[in-house]
Amino acid sequence: MKLTVVTFALLAFISFNTFAKQVRLDNVAVIVDQGVVLESQIEELVNTVKRNALTNNQTLPSDRVLRTQAIERLIVDSLQNQMAERMGIQISDPQLDQTIDNIAREDGTTVEDLRKNLASEGVSFEVYREQVRKELVTGEVRRANVRRRIYITPQEISNLVTLIDEQGGQQAEYHLGHILIGFPPEPTDEDVSKAKDTAEKVLELLNNGSEFAKIATASSSGSKALEGGDLGWMNINSMPTLFAEAVQGTSKDDLIGPIRSGAGFHVLKIIDFRGIEKVEVAELKSRHILIKPSVILSDEKAEKMLTEFRKELLAGEADFAELAKEHSADPGSALRGGDLGWADPNVYVPAFRDTLQSLEVGEISQPVRSTHGWHLMQLMDKRVQDATEKRKEDKAYQLLFQRKFAEETEAWLKEMRDSAYVELLDEKDNS
């Protein structure tokens, strides 16, 4: 009996200690409004950054600095996740699977190969999968909250179109490194002076050969600090205006700054740059006659009707435009003799598109069934069109939207962070 009691007590002691260790591992490190950041989350993010740095042969600042940056990232993530819950934003498994499939395809691989690559790096596919889900959720939250803050005037579009025209369609893209030495929303002269001095010291270190990514991770207040300040590739027209003006006439590896903005002082590095070629699109001019089957007109009779029209046209006994005006069920083109004008064939449904692309100029197709009904089509002409010129207004709008979205996202995240209740429970995070 004593042996049983001792054994039970020993097992209870082991279980308690094991549980205690788990609790210590998952201690609440930060209270963020109605949520928390766990110690395990901080360690996981720090380890991920270290693993990525090792893979990319990148040096990192001290663990203390890295921990501080990780905590800031997780605070912002927690606030966004809480907002997502309030908004009822969810990503279904099919949506998630499709996204991961797209990621693999864009990388020229398969989901199975992606699994293997993750495993070789010691990353569980399920962990990766849930991380992608979280990124999709935060992306939805940002779009929902930031989009309403963006307004683009016709004059802005017109001005950018003029700029694009002046550049002759040869748009430059820059791969930028970014360090932000921030100051408060309403800085004193002392705040500004202190931030400027720090930015100048950072620039001096970089000019003396210090690694940009390491300095960015240690010192930057920007949203990409944990990525070594890497902003990726940016079109000159989609980057913040201050940056777009500053990078003009620069060369690879140039350092720029400090540049003052409302957020602080920026230091940029031109990691690389490249030009963008004009996009040319093959357009087709065509016309068609559409016959829609109905209760009165069977599918078979509709096809036979177009077959007869084709025979008459090939024999020169009928006029295509007149047949279209009299019989076509497409009201948009019937009044124009079936003329669809110039268009990128990809705007048409697959059956129509594929048939049209297979025709020679002047050739009349066999009757073709699509989701709209039966078509008889004729290819009238072909041309290669400069898509950049044709779509320049849409492009200008998208570039302006991207620029403003990036700027407003930073502002929105800062406002959300500044207004949140945040309590660091571990004193070493406050010191």
UniProtKB/Swiss-Prot annotation:
Keywords: Chaperone, Isomerase, Periplasm, Repeat, Rotamase, Signal
PROSITE patterns, sorted: PPIC_PPIASE_1 (PS01096), PPIC_PPIASE_2 (PS50198)
Cellular component aspect of the GO annotation: outer membrane-bounded periplasmic space
GO biological process: Gram-negative-bacterium-type cell outer membrane assembly; protein folding; protein stabilization
Compartment annotation: Periplasm
Residue ranges annotated for the PpiC domain, each copy included: 171-272, 281-381
EC id: 5.2.1.8
Broad class of enzyme this protein falls into: isomerase
Highest taxon, organism lineage: Bacteria
Cleaved signal peptide residues: 1-20
Stored InterPro entries: OMP_Chaperone_SurA (IPR050280), PPIase_dom_sf (IPR046357), PPIase_PpiC (IPR000297), PPIase_PpiC_CS (IPR023058), PPIase_SurA (IPR023034), SurA_N (IPR015391), Trigger_fact/SurA_dom_sf (IPR027304)
Gene3D superfamilies from the UniProt entry: 3.10.50.40, Porin chaperone SurA, peptide-binding domain
Single GO molecular function: peptidyl-prolyl cis-trans isomerase activity
Catalytic activity annotation: [protein]-peptidylproline (omega=180) = [protein]-peptidylproline (omega=0)
HAMAP family recorded: Chaperone_SurA
Purpose: Chaperone involved in the correct folding and assembly of outer membrane proteins. Recognizes specific patterns of aromatic residues and the orientation of their side chains, which are found more frequently in integral outer membrane proteins. May act in both early periplasmic and late outer membrane-associated steps of protein maturation.
Domain notes: The PPIase activity resides only in the second parvulin domain. The N-terminal region and the C-terminal tail are necessary and sufficient for the chaperone activity of SurA. The PPIase activity is dispensable for SurA to function as a chaperone. The N-terminal region and the C-terminal tail are also required for porin recognition.
Protein name (database record): Chaperone SurA
Organism encoding this protein: Pseudoalteromonas atlantica (strain T6c / ATCC BAA-1087)
Gene designation: surA
